A protein has these predicted regions:
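NTP-dependent small-molecule kinase module
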Residues: 2, 103-104, 144, 166-199
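The conserved Walker
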Residues: 14
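Conserved lysine of the Walker
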Residues: 18
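Post-Walker A alpha-helix
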Residues: 21-22
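Post-Walker A helix-loop "phosphate-sensing" segment adjacent to the P-loop in P-loop NTPases
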Residues: 27-35
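Conserved nucleotide-sensing/catalytic segment adjacent to the nucleotide-binding pocket
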Residues: 35, 44, 48-92
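ATP-dependent NMP and nucleoside kinases share a basic, alpha-helical "lid"
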Residues: 96-148
């Protein structure tokens, strides 16, 4: 049975503006029409690790994310079935015991750094977009976000950037732009995806 659900995948480097782009795109539709899903909700639970080991974990590698669950959730949403989405706590690097009920919508926007690097996940998208922005701007944005929202110091952010973020970007994220239907140079130059195009 063919689904009427339209799924858009939006990827790009950390700090590239993909979340802002996804949010702005969602505003083109009513709350009854559109659903926004973030890759970040699908980080694997590290509760079994010590606090120090969690901090050393490579969160920028695809293996740190439960893409199998994300794919299952997208499949269920296309069938009109509500899902129980994990709630991830970035301060403790673990999933909360509670979940978030997500109802199916006609348009689903999925955003995340690595979503275009997963071949099985690509099959779920009707349209794919890659947000491209210079490295320094991405880093500056990440520093500001992680300090204000995730309780980290600038030194911690810079160490993580040099040891995992940048290497994983070069290995997985940057090559995934070849899977994009549209490559957008920064969120300021957002593409105009009209409702008629997404129907």
């Amino acid at each position: 049975m063919k689904s009427n659900t339209y799924i858009i995948g939006i990827a790009g480097a950390s700090g590239s503006g993909k979340t802002t782009f996804a949010q702005n795109l969602a505003k083109k539709f009513t709350k009854e029409e559109v659903l926004l899903i973030t890759q970040d909700a699908y980080y694997k639970d590290l509760l079994q690790l010590t606090i120090s080991d969690r901090a050393k974990h490579n969160f920028d590698h695809p293996d740190s994310l439960d893409f199998k669950l994300l794919k299952e959730h997208l499949y269920e949403l296309k069938l009109g079935i509500s899902i129980q989405q994990p709630i991830y706590d970035f301060n403790s690097h673990s999933r909360l015991s509670s979940t978030r009920t997500i109802e199916p919508k006609q348009i689903i926007i999925v955003e995340g750094t690595l979503i275009l690097s997963q071949k099985e996940l690509l099959k779920e998208f009707n349209t794919t977009v890659y947000i491209q922005l210079d490295e320094q701007t991405c880093l500056d944005r990440r520093i500001k976000r992680d300090i204000s929202e995730r309780g980290r110091t600038k030194e911690e952010v810079l160490i993580q950037y040099s040891t995992t973020v940048k290497p994983m970007f070069e290995k997985f994220i940057k090559p995934s732009l070849l899977e994009a239907d549209a490559i957008i140079p920064g969120v300021e130059n957002s593409i105009d995806l009209e409702k008629t195009h997404l129907q």
